[in-house]
Amino acid sequence: MVTPSLRRRALALGGTGLALGLGGCAADDPPAATPQAPGAGSATPTNSVLTPWLSITGGWRTDLQAPPQATRPSGARLNFLQPVGVAAQGDVLLVADAAARTLWRVDRGRDTMAAFAQFTGGGAEQGASLQVGNDFSTWIALPAEHMVVQYDGRGRIVRRWRDEANAPRPVAVAVPEDRRELLVGDAGTAQVVVFDPLGRTLRLLGGRRDPVLQSIGAMCFGPRGLYVLDRMAQQVVVLGPAGEVLEIIGENQLVQPRGLAVDRSGRVFVGDDMDQRIKVFRGAQLLASAGGAGGGPGRFGRIEALAIDGNLLYVADSVNARVQVMLVAPPSMERPGAAP
C-alpha cells in the first residue's frame, strides 16, 4: 500500500532533480550497543532537508515478464515482510526482503510488485546492498554466497563477480555510470575490490598494505569519488581513484552508522542505528537530522538501507516492514546554521 502525505510539498518539489544515478546503498550489521550520541544534550539540528511523503508496504502481484513500465495487476495483494535493501530508478524500485527471501520489483506509480529473483544475501538485522541502472539492470551483494550478481531487467542472471581471497564477504557494491568497473566492498577484509566488466580483479583500495578503513558497511559513488561507510570508525570516508582519502564525513557525529546515500549536489545521507535518525551532511557540516524511533510517518523501526533517486530518498525499514519515501529539498532551500 502506498500512503500519501504532504502531497502539496511533493508537487512543489517534484520538478527538482538531484539524482545521482545510483540505485542505493546499504549497511552491514553493526555490533549491538546502546551508547550515547556524541554531544548528547546539545540542540538537535533543524530538519530543512527531508520531509515524509509516502509509505510503501507492498503492492498488487503482477507479471515479472511484463516490461517494467507496462505492468498490470494480475493477482493478490502482497506485503513486505522484512525489507533490508532498496534501489530506485524512476517509479521502479528493487526491494530485498530477507524474510520472504525474495528480491521484489515494485512499480510505485502503479502500486504493483513482482518477484524479481531469489534473495539469499541478508538475514535478520543485516542490510543489503543493491543498485539498479537506467536499463533496470540490477547488481546485488550476496555475502553468504561470497559474490556479487548482476541481473538483467527480467531477473535473469547476467554475470557473477567473485574473489574469495580478497572479498570473502562482499557486503557493498557500487557501479559507475559508464560501467567500466565494478567495485565491491568486503566486510571481512575492510577493502574495496575493483573488478573489470568480465569479472577479473584489477586492484584493491584501502587494503591490508595501506589500510584506510576499519570496516565497510555501505558505499556509493558521489561527486567527489567513492563514499564508504566505515561503521567501526563511525564515519564516512571519501576515496579517490587510487584509494587515497579525500575527505572524512560525520566524524564525532555518528554512533552506529547504517545505510548511506549521496545526491548530485554532494549531500551525504546516513542512517544512524543509535537513534533511528537520518543525518544529512555537506562535507563536515551536519545540515539536518530527521526521523527517530517509532512507527508513524517519518519514524523508523530499523533503518536498513537508503537509496536516492531524483528528489526522493527511499528508506528500507525492516521492523516496520515498509519502505518510506522522503522528499529531499533542493540545495537552495537549505537553511544555513540549521545544525549546531
Residue spans for each PLM region:
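Beta-rich, blade/repeat-based domains predominating
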Residues: 76-89, 121-134, 164-178, 210-224, ...
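Conserved beta-propeller blade signature
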Residues: 93-95, 137-140, 181-184, 226-228, ...
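Bacterial signal peptide processing site
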Residues: 26-29
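N-terminal secretory signal peptides and thylakoid transit peptides that target proteins
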Residues: 1-17
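A short beta-strand motif characteristic of beta-propeller blades
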Residues: 68-76, 112-120, 157-163, 201-209, ...
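Short loop/turn segments immediately following the C-termini of beta-strands
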Residues: 98, 143, 187, 231, ...
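Short loop/turn segments that connect beta-strands within beta-propeller blades
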Residues: 107-111, 152-156, 196-200, 240-244, ...
